[in-house]
């Protein structure tokens, strides 16, 4: 198995950037397209959790859940072969001084398109 094949890594970096851009403006349609349309898709948020693409879409419809001024740091993408990847990042937001956010996503290439199949977000006191 090839780890971080350059072509695959570039694909994942691009789709992650699209996800981040959609998240910051709460583009719910774009976000929904980036998640696997399945009842097996899971998202664990800071104060919430969803166990299907439908539940995730309903959560997103409630309104923005992210500070649009958040700043990513220590972002790491790792690909395994050509159809599986993880994206891990930390973030800081002016609206939450002294707090450090952590976000992890599992991506799979399904029917030729990269989709988030599992995601987890948490926030801790900054060390």
Predicted regions and their residues:
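Short beta-strand segments enriched in hydrophobic/aromatic residues
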Residues: 35-36, 91-93, 120-123
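Short, low-complexity N-terminal intrinsically disordered segments enriched in polar/charged residues
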Residues: 1-38, 49, 126-127
């Amino acid at each position: 198995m090839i780890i971080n094949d350059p072509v695959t890594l570039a694909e994942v970096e691009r789709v992650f950037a699209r996800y981040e851009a959609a998240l910051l403006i709460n583009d719910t349609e774009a976000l929904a397209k980036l998640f696997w349309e399945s009842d097996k898709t899971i998202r664990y948020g800071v104060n919430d959790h969803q166990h299907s693409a439908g539940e995730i879409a309903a959560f997103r419809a409630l309104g923005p859940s992210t500070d649009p001024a958040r700043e990513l740091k220590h972002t790491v993408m790792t690909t395994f072969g050509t159809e599986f990847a993880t994206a891990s990042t930390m973030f800081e937001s002016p609206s939450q001084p002294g707090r450090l956010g952590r976000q992890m996503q599992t991506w799979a290439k399904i029917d030729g398109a990269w989709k988030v199949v599992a995601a987890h977000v948490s926030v801790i006191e900054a060390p």
